[in-house]
């Protein structure tokens, strides 16, 4: 990896538009989902059994990249509020991480299987395997046959999905604020079998390990009370279905779903390990017995988070839920992941939440559980859980030095969680697709696995049909849907919620500014996602630009907000080459000098038009001055951004430099923008805007 490696990987490199097409897979619906799978931590993989050459390979990619010399411009790495760690600090951290990960002579209480079995055998035997989703999903014969059939159907392009809609909340349709869409895979030519999922809305039916019930005060059924959010997702989560969940508020909602999924993954890790211990004892009694209870490698859970601050909160919650007091390298973890800093109070609350603490987006952390301790910074192949950022893991699985490239440790991941997807999407989201390409592949090397105990669906390359994926996001986007539809194949099906947005709660309804808001629709022939950018550009240059040049209102103060960087480049080049408009442009890659000068010239009216990208707004949240008109080239991905940008006009009016009766907001959209429009104008209005006879709609 050269000096530019990390900088380039953080940069937006738009893949072909077809990559995020909701219908990119034949027969796959846009109702998202997620994939998971379950048991099997290889007890054979012990610290004292690891070979030194394996150790050298695991973090080698991470170490090499961190050591590479590079300079990162603050604008390009989007750290307005937080200083970059120095290169020397990164080198020192990489050295320490490497040394800790591969240190020899580590005492491992987990090796004491006999004591473990004696203490836990009663609990292990008490599990009802016939009813426990853990066993029916990962160890059931019916599930194995179904996975094999789906694997053949996928190869033959005959895999399809059938969906049903479930009401969530009030039985009164006028009061319903949320739907759930449940989709199951089936084979073309066969009659799809889909039934309403069993909703228990409680943890008491899901066989949590006794140690977790004790630690988290869940022994008493009455104390199992869940929040409204948790009641909605507990059943699909514990039944190992894929989940795409859109939540409402930062902080509170994130704490609630993390409380639930940390319990789930701990339960999964413990059951995986206990099953192996149980079968080990059976093999001692009867060596001729056969038990298929393992995968190729030990890591079973992958948690992807946007920043070190998010990772710190997640790992801290895992420690808290586990009840284990001994945590190796806890101080080091706090030093490298915790930061008490907070963004300025003048910034929006959402910005303060996303960018608080340590915003470094480059990390990979192995977490290992033993009977008495949690070991942080553990060797990947000895870890139960891997917590990472998309960039951090991508730099390992796609290392430019093929000798240092590693992805075998992802071969047996059974639960994948993407936390705060909306924030990750503003990084380079293509890293997520890359990571999913490396999940559940058959390893290139043997890593001390006992092949006599590896499940057949691992050997037959069908693990992706057993993996559970859970995605949590502030708002569902086409990219989130695409990731689920293309990369997630869980045989248990997909569960996705759909928030019903009233007109009063929409961005238009809560903007608090009585300004003309005009929505103009353009048509896309065949509703092709691949062709949509061309139709949008043609509409913008032929209709919107002419309105700007022939405006009967203000001849300056027009802000053009462009979500996609590739669209921004295209519009900028057109305005430079084909028009005589005096304009400036600022984007996430602009130097600070350019950012400052263009904003000043625009405020003074010396630049009539200013091009402004969504990623710059996400990472900076500028208070732009001098805005009299706003043009949205495309509806903002985040509905909060719509209100923030429109309110720029209000500030100009307050200063006496504009009149609300003259100022306008114009938004270009097509039928394919339904997801974004729904949050901006409301669910019912979106149906009218996308399918109504008129092509122009106005709100005030």
UniProtKB/Swiss-Prot annotation:
GO terms for biological process: maturation of SSU-rRNA from tricistronic rRNA transcript (SSU-rRNA, 5.8S rRNA, LSU-rRNA). GO terms for cellular component: nucleolus; small-subunit processome. The keyword rRNA processing applies. Residues 82-132 have a biased composition (Acidic residues). GO terms for molecular function: rRNA binding; U3 snoRNA binding. It comes from the Eukaryota. Residues 1-139 are annotated as: Disordered. It is found in: Nucleus, Nucleolus. Keywords: Nucleus, Ribonucleoprotein, Ribosome biogenesis, rRNA processing. Residues 1-11, 41-57, 67-81 have a biased composition (Basic and acidic residues). The keyword Electron transport does not apply. It comes from Candida glabrata (strain ATCC 2001 / BCRC 20586 / JCM 3761 / NBRC 0622 / NRRL Y-65 / CBS 138). Component of the ribosomal small subunit (SSU) processome composed of at least 40 protein subunits and snoRNA U3. This is U3 small nucleolar RNA-associated protein 25. DEAD-box RNA helicase-like protein required for pre-18S rRNA processing, specifically at sites A0, A1, and A2. Belongs to the UTP25 family.
């Amino acid at each position: 990896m050269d000096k530019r490696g990390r900088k380039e990987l953080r940069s937006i490199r738009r893949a072909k538009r077809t990559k995020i097409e909701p219908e990119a897979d034949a027969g796959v619906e846009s109702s998202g989902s997620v994939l998971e799978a379950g048991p099997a931590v290889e007890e054979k993989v012990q610290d004292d059994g690891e070979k030194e050459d394996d150790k050298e390979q695991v973090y080698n990619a991470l170490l090499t990249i961190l050591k590479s010399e590079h300079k990162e411009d603050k604008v390009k790495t989007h750290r307005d509020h937080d200083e970059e760690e120095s290169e020397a600090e990164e080198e020192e951290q990489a050295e320490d991480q490497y040394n800790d990960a591969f240190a020899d002579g580590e005492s491992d209480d987990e090796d004491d299987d006999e004591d473990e079995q004696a203490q836990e055998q009663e609990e292990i035997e008490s599990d009802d395997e016939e009813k426990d989703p853990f066993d029916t999903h990962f160890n059931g014969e019916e599930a194995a046959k179904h996975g094999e059939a789906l694997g053949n159907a996928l190869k033959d392009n005959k895999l399809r999905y059938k969906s049903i809609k479930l009401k969530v909340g009030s039985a009164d349709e006028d009061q319903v604020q949320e739907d759930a869409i449940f989709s199951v895979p089936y084979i073309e030519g066969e009659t799809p079998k889909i039934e309403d999922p069993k909703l228990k809305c409680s943890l008491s039916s899901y066989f949590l390990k006794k140690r977790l019930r004790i630690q988290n005060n869940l022994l008493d059924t009455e104390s199992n009370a869940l929040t409204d959010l948790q009641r909605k997702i507990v059943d699909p989560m514990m039944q190992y279905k894929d989940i795409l969940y859109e939540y409402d508020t930062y902080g509170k909602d994130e704490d609630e779903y993390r409380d639930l999924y940390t319990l789930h993954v701990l339960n999964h890790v413990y059951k995986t390990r206990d099953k192996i211990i149980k079968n080990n004892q059976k093999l001692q009694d009867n060596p001729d017995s056969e038990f298929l209870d393992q995968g190729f490698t030990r890591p079973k859970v992958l948690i992807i988070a946007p920043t070190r601050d998010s990772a710190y909160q997640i790992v801290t919650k895992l420690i808290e839920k586990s009840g284990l007091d001994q945590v190796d390298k806890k101080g080091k973890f706090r030093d490298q992941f915790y930061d008490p800093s907070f963004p300025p109070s003048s910034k929006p609350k959402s910005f303060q939440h996303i960018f608080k603490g340590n915003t470094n987006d480059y990390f990979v952390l192995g977490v290992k559980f033993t009977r008495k301790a949690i070991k942080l910074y553990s060797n990947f192949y000895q870890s139960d859980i891997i917590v990472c950022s998309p960039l951090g893991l991508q730099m390992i699985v796609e290392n430019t030095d093929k000798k240092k490239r590693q992805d075998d440790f992802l071969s047996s991941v059974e639960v994948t969680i993407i936390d705060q997807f909306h924030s990750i999407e503003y990084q380079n989201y293509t890293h997520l697709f890359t990571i999913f390409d490396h999940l559940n592949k058959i390893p290139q090397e043997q890593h001390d696995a006992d092949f006599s105990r590896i499940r057949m669906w691992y050997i037959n390359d069908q693990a992706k049909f057993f993996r559970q994926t859970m995605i949590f996001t502030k708002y569902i986007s086409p990219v989130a849907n695409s990731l689920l539809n293309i990369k997630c194949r869980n045989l248990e099906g997909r569960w996705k919620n759909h928030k019903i947005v009233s007109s009063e709660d929409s961005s238009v309804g809560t903007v608090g500014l009585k300004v003309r808001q005009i929505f103009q629709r353009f048509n896309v022939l065949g509703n092709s996602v691949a062709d949509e950018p061309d139709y949008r550009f043609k509409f913008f240059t032929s209709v919107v630009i002419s309105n700007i040049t022939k405006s009967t209102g203000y001849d300056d103060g027009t802000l053009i907000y462009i979500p996609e960087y590739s669209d921004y480049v295209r519009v900028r080049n057109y305005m430079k080459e084909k028009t005589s408009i005096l304009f400036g442009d600022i984007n996430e890659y602009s130097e600070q000098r350019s950012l400052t000068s263009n904003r000043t010239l625009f405020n003074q009216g010396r630049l009539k038009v200013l091009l402004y990208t969504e990623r710059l707004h996400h990472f900076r949240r500028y208070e732009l001055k001098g805005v009299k008109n706003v043009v949205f080239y495309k509806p903002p991905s985040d509905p909060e951004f719509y209100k923030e940008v429109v309110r720029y006009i209000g500030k100009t009016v307050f200063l006496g430099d504009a009149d609300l009766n003259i100022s306008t907001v114009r938004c270009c959209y097509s039928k394919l923008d339904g997801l974004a429009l729904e949050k901006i104008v409301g669910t019912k209005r979106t149906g009218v805007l996308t399918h109504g006879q008129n092509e122009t709609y106005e709100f005030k």
